Amino acid sequence: MYDTDQNINTKITVQTLAGLVFNSILKKANLKLKVRRIHLGAKLPLQNDELHKDSFDENEVTILYYTAKEWKKEWGGETIVSNERVTYVPNRAVIYPSTELHGGVAPKTANFRTYINYVGIKI
């Protein structure tokens, strides 16, 4: 939806809403970042992510925001960040260096594991 490296800027309403969520997270976490990328994601069972890095730039930070309205722990859908499992909890923002290996675990339910993935540059 938005990526400065790939010159993507969809300018759709959901992009504006995602930007508002980003700014709210920054304020609550007391972070100063300039957004570089916004991706929306939705995964179903069997859709495990490969472990990957969002960036190789030490000045970039990833914010993974879980968007599901309801989620039960037994549904799984954790995120692995540097070999640590982070439980999917609605309205949770997971913040980590973009250089960290991470990946999402497929849910054990027919419900989508939804999220917004932000990459920001420290300012």
Question: Residue ranges of each PLM-predicted region?
Answer:
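Non-heme Fe(II)/2-oxoglutarate
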Residues: 1-34, 43
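Catalytic core of Fe(II)/2-oxoglutarate
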Residues: 40, 57, 68-123
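Glycine-centered flexibility motif
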Residues: 1, 46, 76-77
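Substrate-binding/active-site groove segments that recognize
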Residues: 63
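Conserved short histidine dyad/triad with adjacent acidic residue
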Residues: 40-57
